Amino acid sequence: MPDLTNEILEFFSIDTSDQSLVEKQIPKSIDDFVSQPQYLNTLDLHKFTKIINILKNEGILMSGGILPNGNLPISNEVLIAPSYDAAVAQYGTYSFLTNGFVSIAESFAGAVRPIVIVSNDDEPDIGTGFLLGNKHTVITARHVVDNAKLITLTNSKGELATVREVIFPNDKNIDIAIILVDNFVFYDTKHFNAVAPEILEQVLTIGYPPIPGFDAFQLYEISSINNSYKFSNGQIIGKEISYLDGIEYFILNAKVKGGNSGSPVINRSGNMIGMIIQIPMDSEDFDKIDKLGYGILTPSSEIVKYLGGGEKKEDVTIFRCENIDKGFRILT
């Protein structure tokens, strides 16, 4: 089904790559758009006007002036979309901005999956993972899958993913795990793109916190990025004298629990800007953060760095996996 936001932007787009081309392009008015055969007597003018106003506020659509006549009160305005990008439109960014977080949650529901584990102590637990960059790469928090004797990952239809490898950073303070899926259970699932986070931007988290008496289901939380915090070299942050070497984290003013570990943090454009993690600290500090209701996320740049194998070969270790009846296990 055609998307009205993308159709508006494509209609009013101009090629700004060459100044001589810009001068030759004829600007179009709102009347030109609404007079198209497919919209005559069918266009929802309230929705159309709302989308136009949002795109203007976002700086994606610009007014090019007023024509001397028109069939409707607003129809004589000329509009220009100078930075329209077909790839951005296909990803859904423009539509996400006009339709809000609900449309993002609907579009990426299948890309965010529960990761159910059985620990070495035979205790069940749950975390979250998400597709990033392609149909075969699932990102989660390291502590979700590390030391598990059984890991279950399925698509939205309940079909089991077969896993070839799991990649861990060699620095165990980095709470990132990369799961490489071998089969095509996510072939029809939309994956996330990654961009950098910004302070105070509004974000959405999608995760699977365990709630007694219920099967795993997605919960949504809208919040904002409050601040970034960078551990300085050699700072002691736990009783075990763990040191973090210049690792940057962001603070989220959303209360995140258990199964939210590994949840993607998503901005208004539908891009993944980071992941909910745990950081090494003593129990007293952890309780303080928990009571404040904050979440901690690692930024997308840290995740992308390890997707490429790290800056040096010794930055990561690749573990082969054995696929069994109800999931897979990591061979160590």
Feature-to-residue mapping (PLM):
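Flexible, gly/ser-rich surface segments that form the specificity/activation loops bordering the active-site cleft
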Residues: 188-250, 256-260, 276-292
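N-terminal activation segment of mature serine protease catalytic domains
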Residues: 84-128, 138, 315-316, 324-328
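A short, conserved structural fragment
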Residues: 56-68
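Short amphipathic alpha-helical interaction segments
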Residues: 41-57
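Terminal peptide-recognition signature
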Residues: 115, 129, 135-136, 140, ...
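Catalytic-histidine neighborhood of serine endopeptidases
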Residues: 78-93, 102, 124-126, 132-174, ...
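Short amphipathic alpha-helical interface segments
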Residues: 1-42
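C-terminal subregion of chymotrypsin/trypsin-like serine protease catalytic domains
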Residues: 63-64, 267-332
